[in-house]
Amino acid sequence: MAHPHLLAERISRLSSSLEKGLYERSHAIRLCLLAALSGESVFLLGPPGIAKSLIARRLKFAFQNARAFEYLMTRFSTPEEVFGPLSIQALKDEGRYERLTSGYLPEAEIVFLDEIWKAGPAILNTLLTAINERQFRNGAHVEKIPMRLLVAASNELPEADSSLEALYDRMLIRLWLDKVQDKANFRSMLTSQQDENDNPVPASLQVTDEEYERWQKEIGEITLPDHVFELIFMLRQQLDKLPDAPYVSDRRWKKAIRLLQASAFFSGRSAVAPVDLILLKDCLWYDAQSLNLIQQQIDVLMTGHAWQQQGMLTRLGAIVQRHLQLQQQQSDKTALTVIRLGGIFSRRQQYQLPVNVTASTLTLLLQKPLKLHDMEVVHISFERSALEQWLSKGGEIRGKLNGIGFAQKLNLEVDSAQHLVVRDVSLQGSTLALPGSSAEGLPGEIKQQLEELESDWRKQHALFSEQQKCLFIPGDWLGRIEASLQDVGAQIRQAQQC
């Protein structure tokens, strides 16, 4: 086998060649290529005239000497038009019921069937066998068919509870296409002189029959790690809980896993990675409503769980809570404690400063910063005499915020532990302490836990950076995952600075 990274590079170059001259169809081409390389089927949904047939025609050039068959279904289509006419000679001379399949679906590697839902039962039943078993019954004989890719297309979905659902379930990849949207792309499409039927793929990039057969075996050897299976099972359970979620058969899950294995294989990896699960957004939907729902659920999975984002945030929350507990314990030890005086029969409890507090101006530190008078305050300066009078008689108390400017009126109180507490307009409080009595920096326990968490974050981010080199995943999804990881990292760093 070629070096995995060389294979990934080759498939990327092959896809780029197939995409030439097709505007805003890169994702569709890449997924159709992935389907062709893994022997799966694709359904293209969209209005007429948006290059659905051209996509299928292009895929023929991915393979050396591949044969293509395409057909536009109508209500009057017959099996002869798809699978080949009956051999009059065989019927006349030998009494054999046999079709002449040369040039028809049974001998084609790439098949495109437009307006698929207009096919009649006779065509559908034979087509189901062809998709499921890659076999075609020709008279008394069962023949293997070489079909590598079936692309079915329509401008509508099959009716619910119709005989078409069995065929629809066989279409593993489902893509919703629309007209060219970008102005520059639209102009390029209008002015392009490229012959759409020319082969854009160099012979050196085309897949040989031997390579294709070997790859089918090697795709099956790609492993499904436990943590990736857990993500898949989490998604399945979540979908089962949602009343509007589409029904996903066990067969579809099974086929989807092989597609994920193929994605990993052609990305140069030996195991399925969480990033491959994004492909499920194009496999599990049924209609427009379920398309949005599936994308939402996979987005939650990718940005919240696939790289342990939510788990790391939960750990961070526990660490922050523990830090707050330690801060509270430290506050109780280091806070300025005033002395309660007699005054049993007085209306107001009286206090005085400790005897060791003798400075004429006291600078007291806030155990946690507060916003007071539109200023972020970390310490307050009091005149000792003013503070003593307030402790004894109550009334108004003023202090200089951060030791600057005029003294400002403060909401100060003595709590049940005889500590001075200043409150902001929302009544959030901060205990006051003498300089030098407040703990400096993070406690060792908290610092170690945050360092371990940051180390785990770096590992997850490195894993994502390595896995995101995947041709088949759209860049906007990778961007959202990167943003979710960066958000977790920023919160960890912020906690380390507290």
From Swiss-Prot:
Taxonomic superkingdom: Bacteria
GO-annotated cellular components: cytoplasm
Reactions it catalyzes: ATP + H2O = ADP + phosphate + H(+)
Entries under Pfam families matching the protein: AAA_lid_8, ATPase_RavA_C, bpMoxR, LARA_dom
Alphabetical keyword list: ATP-binding, Chaperone, Cytoplasm, Hydrolase, Nucleotide-binding
EC number: 3.6.1.-
Compartment list: Cytoplasm
SMART domains: AAA
The keyword RNA-binding is annotated on this UniProt entry: no
Activity control mechanisms: ATPase activity is stimulated by ViaA.
Gene Ontology MF terms in the entry: ATP binding; ATP hydrolysis activity
Chief location bin: cytoplasm
Residues binding ADP, per UniProt: 23, 49-54, 196
Quaternary organization: Homohexamer. Interacts with ViaA.
PANTHER family: ATPASE RAVA (PTHR32204:SF0)
Protein task: Component of the RavA-ViaA chaperone complex, which may act on the membrane to optimize the function of some of the respiratory chains. RavA functions as an ATPase.
Protein name as annotated: Regulatory ATPase RavA
Source organism phylogeny: Bacteria, Pseudomonadati, Pseudomonadota, Gammaproteobacteria, Enterobacterales
